[in-house]
Every structure is written in C-alpha cells, then in structure tokens.
C-alpha cells in the first residue's frame, strides 16, 4: 500500500496548476488535470486531461466520481464549489477543505469571516446590490474608494473611484467582470499603503503551521505584475502578519499552502484577501527557495515532512504579458533573456493570447532586491509574444 495518496486531481489547469502537477509527478503521483478548455498548461504535463464546464456541478461530480482520486486540489476560483462539499461527504479529500474553497471564492464571505468573526483588521468596507445602493454606502467611506465584484479573479471588474459621478461606471465594470450570477459588490476605503505582501502559510497534517519569508508585490488593475522575496518587514509587522495568517487558516482548516495577502500601512498590518492554494506572486519561490510554494503545497497535502524552508538573499519576478489577440503563440527574445546568470524564464504554454494575458514570467536572484528586480525586468522585457504557426 502506498505511504501517501497517489492520484491527484487538479480542478483548474493554468500555470499554477502546471507547477503543482510537476511537483506531484516528481513525488510519484498520477495527475488528472481538469479545465474548461483543451491544451491548458497543466494538461500538457498531466497523465490524464479532462475538459468540462467547471461551473457545472453535475459535470464536476461525474468526472471526480469516475476517476476516484485520492485528493482533489482546486486551482481556480470559477468552480461549482457546492459540489465539493458533496464529494467530501462521499469521503473524497478536498484540499484544503470544501468550506475553505467556498469561503475564499466570495469576497463577502472571507471578509465577514476575517473582520466579523475573527476580528482581524481590514479596510473599512460595505456591500451594495445595486448602483443606487453603491452610491449610498460609498459616500461615508470617503474618496477614493475601491469597488470590486464579490466574485471575480485576477482583478476583473475592479476600479478605483474618485467621486460619486464615477460610481455608475464602476458598477457597470464590476458587473461585467463578475463571475457567475453574482450582482453584489464590495466597496472599500482606499488605503494609502506602503507595501502589499503575500505571506505563504503552510498548514501541515500534523497541525504545525510554517511560513515562508514574506513576498512583496505590485499590482496593476488588481493583477500581479512583479514580486520579490524577502519583503522588508519589522519584527513587529512580521509577527502580526503571521498571527493573523495562522488565525484565519486555522479557522478554514485542512492541509496545504495558503496565500494570505496583507497591506502594510505605517506600522499597521491590514488583512486583504486569501487564496487556499499557491499564489501567483509566489512564482518567485521557484528561484528563491529550496522548496517552491508548489512543492510545499504537495508535501503538506500528502502529509510529507518539511524539515526546513530556506531562501536566497534576494529574488524577484516580472510577468510576461501578451499585447494582442492570437489564436496560437510563439516567443521571441528568449535567448537574450537568458544571458544573465541566476535568471530563468518560464513560458506557461497557454495555447491562445489576448491583451494583458499572462503568458510567462521572468525570475532572477541577486545580492539585493534592486539587483534581482532589475535582472527580472530586463529578462521579461526581452521576451515578446508573437503569433505562432497554426499548422497541424
């Protein structure tokens, strides 16, 4: 009998899922990759690929029951999450838990948990279910405010609003970017923060919680552009962030890696969001740590030891984005991007492109953050996404 689960099913097969699949296969696991479109990145390295509408509960239940995996690892947010609870009741392990997946895919549920039940410090916020209600709740928060759909991903539908006249446009953007049938937004005070960080938090099956060195990152339109590790925090800030991350992940339960996001404002640490899975800003750990966030996730999921997490003095990442729509893709400039030492380029293998779609990432190590970020930026700037051949 195997000493740990051997069949892993990924619900979502993007670039993060691809790295999870690679980490799983290096541990001898069989990987089944599921997504809504064929040829998704993780499918390219999986043992089995399944294409299905991921928000269709019946389709999701059918594919899981047919394969009977040892563990199901959700890797995206656009899922029929209520089906996961049904699978858990049937004895299938959902990572970290079905409840954690459901709570964190809804900004209102995770915010109510963090601010209300767990009493974590967050930005002041309110909810609105119409353009008229949005105007009523935004004014007391003061300008500017941030408007987001309660259900969306990768910054879709988010906007910063400077005055009441711009709220109707923000409402329309939120509805256009919302996932599923949600018609509610969360509106938050705009925080003039010093730094935005991700604290990768690992819950092990033995009950122990581990932390990676904090990762600083910059976003544009709610989508990650670059990250670096370690981010510079005071001892007090780090202690606050770790305490809050442990509080919320203990409540969500299960085993695995969580990406817990915080704002740093002066000396205050403010909870932002949480993903119960490897985080895009954590791609930097592929070059910065002895164990990447993907390897850590798999070790925690499978109940394997994590003796130590060590990191380089400084490492950084910069995304590689598409500029136009393309039915097939290729890349130019990779050879120039790889001329510097301690630099890597990852091209995700997405079959098509659209403006702003993340197609790859450049990673670099340096003696300090400035050097590492400059190297990653130079490498990313070398790479262009171009139309590929459509020949079969």
Curated annotation (Swiss-Prot):
The keyword Acyltransferase does not apply. It catalyses: N(1)-(5-phospho-beta-D-ribosyl)glycinamide + formate + ATP = N(2)-formyl-N(1)-(5-phospho-beta-D-ribosyl)glycinamide + ADP + phosphate + H(+). InterPro entries: ATP-grasp, ATP-grasp_carboxylate-amine, ATP_grasp_subdomain_1, PreATP-grasp_dom_sf, PurT, PurT/PurK_preATP-grasp, PurT_C, Rudment_hybrid_motif. Its EC number is 6.3.1.21. Pfam families: ATP-grasp, PurT_C, RS_preATP-grasp-like. Pathway: Purine metabolism; IMP biosynthesis via de novo pathway; N(2)-formyl-N(1)-(5-phospho-D-ribosyl)glycinamide from N(1)-(5-phospho-D-ribosyl)glycinamide (formate route): step 1/1. N(1)-(5-phospho-beta-D-ribosyl)glycinamide binds at residues 15-16, 75, 280, 350, 357-358. One of its GO terms (molecular function) is phosphoribosylglycinamide formyltransferase 2 activity. Gene3D superfamilies: 3.40.50.20, ATP-grasp fold, A domain, ATP-grasp fold, B domain. Mg(2+) binds at residues 261, 273. GO terms for biological process: 'de novo' IMP biosynthetic process. It is an enzyme of class 6 (ligase). Residues 112-302 form the ATP-grasp domain. Keywords: ATP-binding, Ligase, Magnesium, Metal-binding, Nucleotide-binding, Purine biosynthesis. Involved in the de novo purine biosynthesis. Catalyzes the transfer of formate to 5-phospho-ribosyl-glycinamide (GAR), producing 5-phospho-ribosyl-N-formylglycinamide (FGAR). Formate is provided by PurU via hydrolysis of 10-formyl-tetrahydrofolate. Belongs to the PurK/PurT family. This is Formate-dependent phosphoribosylglycinamide formyltransferase. It comes from Synechococcus sp. (strain CC9605). The lineage of its organism: Bacteria, Bacillati, Cyanobacteriota, Cyanophyceae, Synechococcales. The gene is purT.
